[in-house]
Amino acid sequence: MAAELEPLMAEWLGAEKAEDTRGQAASLNTMEDLLETVKKLQKEGSLEPQIEDLIHRINELQQGPAKKRSSEELGEAQALQEAMHRELDSLNEERVHLEEVLRKKQEAVSILKKHPQERDSDTPHLDAQQLEERLADLARQHKDLWEFHVLQQRLAQEISTMEHRKDQLLAERTLLRARLEKVEQRLQEARETWDSPGNCGLKTELEELEGQSQRSPEAQNDKGEASQEEQHHLETSEELPRTGTLC
């Protein structure tokens, strides 16, 4: 059985050398030590009891650091491959973007080259009369723009003046209404106390009030609402009965 084990060990050692060529010096030394141990035990005649131990150690060596290192290297290679694929995809996207930018720039350059040619081809056809017409047209446009600007400023100034005048008129109207209401109130009081005995100076006071109401600017304006009311009250006061004894 020892004779059968020795070729098996040699075959496994050769396969192990073919599989792992990176840093397997320690494992090879261990296998050589095992072979030496097998030969030594064969000479001593005590090989049979330790065959199972040798097989167990061989299995451990097969599944030991070499296999682990190979798995780690395989994982690193796969990770590197994925990273390279991602980088390749990114480079492809960048290439597409740069090609698009290059295409747009080439189109812009082509347009810029085409326009000067068109201007150069149109220039000889322009004579002095056309140039004068263009200059006159530009002058008219400039004049119209300036007149519009001046008119706009003038309108803004007039609007501001009108707004100020409007505020003044509103203030005057408010003041006149207050004065008119005061006069109407005094007229109403005079009408209520007209026939009351003991009011000697009532007629004189009423005439003064009527004179004040007639002298007010609001009474002279026939179109104003307040003047119409005042005229109505004045006419009513004139139609009051003037009976009784006055002092």
Swiss-Prot record:
<feature type="coiled-coil region">
    <location>
        <begin position="71"/>
        <end position="196"/>
    </location>
</feature>
<comment type="similarity">
    <text>Belongs to the SYCE family.</text>
</comment>
<protein>
    <recommendedName>
        <fullName>Synaptonemal complex central element protein 1-like</fullName>
    </recommendedName>
</protein>
<keyword id="KW-0175">Coiled coil</keyword>
<dbReference type="GO" id="GO:0000795">
    <property type="term" value="C:synaptonemal complex"/>
</dbReference>
<dbReference type="GO" id="GO:0007130">
    <property type="term" value="P:synaptonemal complex assembly"/>
</dbReference>
<keyword id="KW-0469">Meiosis</keyword>
<feature type="compositionally biased region" description="Basic and acidic residues">
    <location>
        <begin position="220"/>
        <end position="241"/>
    </location>
</feature>
<dbReference type="Pfam" id="PF15233">
    <property type="entry name" value="SYCE1"/>
</dbReference>
<feature type="region of interest" description="Disordered">
    <location>
        <begin position="189"/>
        <end position="247"/>
    </location>
</feature>
<dbReference type="InterPro" id="IPR026676">
    <property type="entry name" value="SYCE1"/>
</dbReference>
<comment type="function">
    <text>May be involved in meiosis. Isoform 1 may be involved in meiosis during spermatogenesis while isoform 2 is probably related to a later stage of meiosis, in the development stage of secondary spermatocytes and spermatids.</text>
</comment>
